[in-house]
């Protein structure tokens, strides 16, 4: 099966058929983000790109002081995890699972990590990781919250069978109605 991703519109296709993303499923469960301010959203995207650049090359290029503080938090996390750079293999790859797709930020041997730069939303953040976990209880999941003061916080999320069932049900509804 061929999985394609179009960043314009955040659209996934499996063998040419449009399917919902993890983000769309989570938004259908918890509602859309209340009027997302484009500035923090763009900053979060840029910080993610810097983190991926750092994993890919072991270096970064930015003169944005505000974003650099978030990147410093990420660099501390990399150092404390003793990750040898460059480590492009850790950058998340697209997943396709029974009618939905997504791209986790970081995928290790047994852990999926999702980087967050905004306000912590525990239920929503956990549900997103449940989608990436795809029912595999052996995979550990963590949210890595990067803070603007150069610190970070890890929240480990446990597998939750009920949340997995809710996620699957919403994926089926979206696939049936094609409203995504």
Model-derived features with residue positions:
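Metal-dependent nuclease catalytic cores that hydrolyze phosphodiester bonds in DNA/RNA
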Residues: 1-101
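Nucleic-acid nuclease catalytic cores
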Residues: 93-180
């Amino acid at each position: 099966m061929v999985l394609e991703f179009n960043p314009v519109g955040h659209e996934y296709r499996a063998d040419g058929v449009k399917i919902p993303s993890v983000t769309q499923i989570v938004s259908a469960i918890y509602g859309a983000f209340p009027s997302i301010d484009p500035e923090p959203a763009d900053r979060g995207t840029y910080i993610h790109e810097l983190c991926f650049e750092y994993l890919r090359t072991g270096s970064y290029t930015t003169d944005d002081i505000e974003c650099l503080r978030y990147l410093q938090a990420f660099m501390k996390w990399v150092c404390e995890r003793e990750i040898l750079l460059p480590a492009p293999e850790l950058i998340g790859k697209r997943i396709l699972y029974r009618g939905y797709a997504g791209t986790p930020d970081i995928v290790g041997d047994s852990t999926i990590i999702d980087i967050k730069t905004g306000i912590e939303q525990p239920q929503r953040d956990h549900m997103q990781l449940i989608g990436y976990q795809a029912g595999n209880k052996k995979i550990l999941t963590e949210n890595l919250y990067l803070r603007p003061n150069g610190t970070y916080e890890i929240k480990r999320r446990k597998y939750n069978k009920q949340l997995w069932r809710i996620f699957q049900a919403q994926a089926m509804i979206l696939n049936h109605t094609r409203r995504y």
